[in-house]
């Protein structure tokens, strides 16, 4: 049985304590066997169709495009059960865990979407569920915390470091190193030690496969570009995987530029990172001059990650994919724009991809087809956005008042 390549070019690998090597090797073997097992594939496909609601729609937007030459399609992962693309690969990994005889699932979550997806899969498949979540994220994503608990998950707030996603990842990995005989670590993104980046890509691959057949049916040709937001990179690699060999299709990932790419407040390791070892892999990483991990920042909890999946690093290095960025303000604008123009409220993560797509659409000089992976819905973000908009309103009023005072003096 052939083993999988742990590297994508120079990126990837298995940089973990020796104690975890048997667990990762066992996982790799189980995954290879499952990929070749017709009954496993059948059960996975059946769950995706009849439980999760696949295939998801490919929606041509009516009013979003600012340019009559550009059509913008949305791949509607927001319509999936659980509210985001996360459900796809979580069902795959949970089935894999059962196949390996594991009784317990350990997971980490940022925005809470991966935690919710893990909780629903565990409830469905009768597995015990433990979710590590940065204390800061527990606070800003309370609806998802309640959803997880409602479905029987134990949510553990992590207070170390910046109390966000990277710290939750570290705690989850630490827990797993002491319990892998009975527990499976259900990693939520296409990053981490081998074989996780490959497993997650293969369990998200249907996003791009469906998109390809749907767009060919609708337009009779492939799109000019597929666009997806990138934190760790699972929704993007799921969209890109089936298009990598289609050279005429541009692959565009959009990282969070936060308060601005030139400030310390962003989460764009592909643009501004240096290669380092983090979370069991070799990948671009936000580091300071002493090599310490810098805190990443994004208005969207799910993109708040200081590194990126190794295959994205390789696609960037070879030039097959390009990686742009969108600021908090651009994402907030796109969030509102989609709601107003199409009646669809996107996740703040997905809004980063939308922001760049609208920018790209404006520049088109010939007929252009863009597909945006709408990776999740925005219910979880409405209170965050409401608070920010209220704050902006107050600041604007104060600035106007100040201006009036200055004119009167």
From Swiss-Prot:
Keywords: Amino-acid biosynthesis, Aromatic amino acid biosynthesis, Lyase, Pyridoxal phosphate, Tryptophan biosynthesis. The modification N6-(pyridoxal phosphate)lysine is found at residue 86. Its EC number is 4.2.1.20. Pathway: Amino-acid biosynthesis; L-tryptophan biosynthesis; L-tryptophan from chorismate: step 5/5. Signal peptide: none annotated. GO terms for cellular component: cytoplasm. It comes from the Bacteria. GO terms for molecular function: tryptophan synthase activity. It catalyses: (1S,2R)-1-C-(indol-3-yl)glycerol 3-phosphate + L-serine = D-glyceraldehyde 3-phosphate + L-tryptophan + H2O. It is an enzyme of class 4 (lyase). Its cofactor is pyridoxal 5'-phosphate. Belongs to the TrpB family. Tetramer of two alpha and two beta chains. The beta subunit is responsible for the synthesis of L-tryptophan from indole and L-serine. This is Tryptophan synthase beta chain. The lineage of its organism: Bacteria, Pseudomonadati, Pseudomonadota, Gammaproteobacteria, Alteromonadales.
